[in-house]
A protein has these predicted regions:
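NAD(P)-dependent short-chain dehydrogenase/reductase
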Residues: 154-220
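Short linear sequence motif anchored by a di-proline
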Residues: 1-15
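Rossmann-fold cofactor-recognition segment
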Residues: 48-59
Length: 230
């Protein structure tokens, strides 16, 4: 109020800045959507966006660059998503590092500072035998990728203030299945390209997760202060 602003004891008091939001994986499909939505809502000034090149959440020393007391929320959009490559020796190590170690360190840091952690998971933590998955279904991953995501979920669930959001077939700005197929088709059609055919699985069922929808869902649970959990 005007009286507070002119009160002799309060005149020189500097108002406490609002808590900031850190978004990891900002260069991925979902990270792009979260950034765009923050800009549209006029709150991007209160956000910090980072990708693995500037903040590798799986490296303990990387956390020294951030003052945890300044943040109220972390939205983890970062992940290793090369499902097939995760079955190789090199990919397996990278997947566990990004999808399990990283979220575990994030969860520990958020717990220490009372930060709300929003973690985006995957339907790969299940075996796909159920027609409908719910929040209480036990983990039953079939792939290395699914195992790493399940491990990350378990770590995040240990953070008192957490939301775990599950995605399926992610479609958005950046690399996605539709753009990949179009690019491969262009290569097959090109006379000077050695690629002569495309092989695609035809026995999978899934539901598209549009990144805009997921970004809006994240903002909704935060704005509504929904009960913590999955």
């Amino acid at each position: 109020s005007e009286a507070d602003l002119n009160h002799p004891m309060l005149r020189d008091v500097v108002p406490m800045a609002p808590k900031r939001t850190l978004v990891t994986g900002c260069d991925g499909q979902l990270g792009h959507a979260v950034r765009r939505l923050a800009e549209e809502r006029g709150v991007a000034k209160d956000f910090d966006f980072c990708d693995i090149d500037t903040f590798d959440m799986s490296v303990p020393d990387a956390y020294a660059q951030y003052d945890g007391s300044l943040y109220g929320t972390v939205i983890n959009c970062g992940a290793y998503t090369a499902v097939d490559k995760a079955e190789t020796s090199e990919g397996r190590a990278a997947a566990w590092k990004a999808n399990a170690t990283g979220p575990a360190l994030l969860a520990r840091t958020c717990s220490e500072h009372g930060i709300t952690l929003v973690h985006v998971s995957s339907d790969y933590v299940f075996d796909g035998t159920a027609e409908v998955h719910d929040e209480d279904e036990p983990f039953s991953p079939l792939s290395v990728y699914g195992q790493t995501k399940a491990a990350g979920d378990i770590a995040v669930a240990g953070c008192p203030r957490h939301y775990i959001m599950r995605s399926s077939w992610v479609i958005g700005e950046g690399r996605n299945f539709v753009k990949t197929m179009r690019g491969l088709s262009d290569r097959v059609a090109a006379p000077d390209d050695k690629l002569d055919k495309i092989t695609v699985v035809d026995d999978q069922l899934g539901r598209l997760t549009f990144t805009r929808d997921m970004a809006e869902a994240i903002f909704h649970v935060l704005d509504a202060k929904a009960p913590y959990g999955t």
